Amino acid sequence: MIELKNVTFGYPGTMRDIYEDFSISLSENKIYGLLGKNGMGKSTLLYLICGLLRASSGKITVDGYDAQLRRPEMLREIMIVPEEFELPKVTLDEYVMINAPFYPRFSKDVLVNCLQNFELPLSLRLDQLSMGQKKKVYMSFALAA
C-alpha cells in the first residue's frame, strides 16, 4: 500500500507548490495510471513516493515504511526508471553482477526473458546503447528485481 497524507511540495525558488495538502491511498494488487500534461508533477509524485524528494509537510508511506527514510525493506518493493540517467561503462552482465546482490529477489531468468523480448543480449556494453535501449535495460532490471 502507498499512502500520501496531507503532502505539500514545491521546488525551491518557485512561486507555488506543485502539491498542496495532497492525500491519496493506493491499494495493493491494483494497477493505477498517472496521466497529465508535461510539467504537471507526475515525475515529482513518483520521486516523492520513492523518497528521492522530500515533502515540506505531510507523510508518505510505502508498505508502512516512511518513504523519506529510504529503508532497504522499502526499496526492495519499489523502483523508478528515471527519464534521464547514465549507465556505467560496463557490460550488462557486469552490471548485473554488481547490482543484483542488493535485490534479494532478483531473478536472472526474468531479466533474460525481458531482454529477449527487447532483442537485447546480456553481453552488450551499456555505454554503447541508445537512450531507448538503455531504458529497456533499466526496465528489464527493475522487473527482475
Annotate each language-model stretch with its function.
Residues C50:
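Helix-to-loop junction immediately C-terminal to a conserved catalytic motif
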Residues K42:
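Conserved lysine of the Walker
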Residues Y32-K37:
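The feature captures the beta-strand-to-loop junction immediately N-terminal to the Walker
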Residues L143-A144:
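ABC ATPase C-loop
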Residues I80-Y138:
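ABC-family P-loop ATPase nucleotide-binding domains
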Residues M1-D21, E28:
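A short, flexible loop at the N-terminus of ABC-type nucleotide-binding domains that lies
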